[in-house]
């Protein structure tokens, strides 16, 4: 999994763009858990509720496929669900611009870290 930090709140929480390499089941969720940064709302890999900053009423998994890149095809883009937008606002995280995230997928040099 490759990732880029888009925005963060100190060391408590970050909004990241993730890019799977193999496409294995739960790859993104498992890798984020492995590096100590589980995805909020992930009841499978994030069972420790004492560190869960999810104080809002929304308990959905905070994982969204905003852009899917199919080899030799165009990028597919999906609108962010309302519950995800509400959570970003609640936590004070800034997506910046949709074009920012879109451009991450166009230039491989933007990806900073690879999780094995």
Give the label of every model feature segment.
Residues 1-15, 30, 44:
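Glycine- and acidic-residue-rich catalytic/RNA-contacting loop of pseudouridine synthases
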Residues 31-116:
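Pseudouridine synthases involved in rRNA/tRNA modification
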Residues 18-21:
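A structural micro-motif recognizing beta-strand termini
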Residues 1, 14, 26, 72-78:
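Short beta-strand segments
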Residues 4-5, 16, 67, 101:
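Extended aliphatic helical segments
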Residues 24-32:
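Short beta-strand segments enriched for Tyr within beta-sheet-rich domains
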Residues 1-2, 23, 51-54:
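Short secondary-structure boundary micro-motifs
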């Amino acid at each position: 999994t490759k990732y880029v930090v888009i925005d963060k709140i100190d060391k408590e929480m970050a909004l990241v763009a993730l890019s799977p390499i193999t496409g294995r089941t739960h790859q993104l969720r498992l890798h984020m858990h492995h590096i100590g940064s589980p995805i909020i709302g992930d009841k499978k890999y994030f069972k420790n509720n004492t560190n869960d900053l999810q104080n809002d009423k929304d308990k959905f998994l905070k994982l969204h496929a905003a852009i899917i890149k199919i080899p030799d095809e165009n990028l597919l883009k999906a609108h962010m669900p309302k519950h995800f937008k509400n959570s970003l606002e609640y936590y004070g995280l800034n997506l910046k611009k949709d074009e920012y995230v879109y451009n991450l997928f166009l230039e491989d040099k933007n990806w900073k870290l690879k999780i094995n």
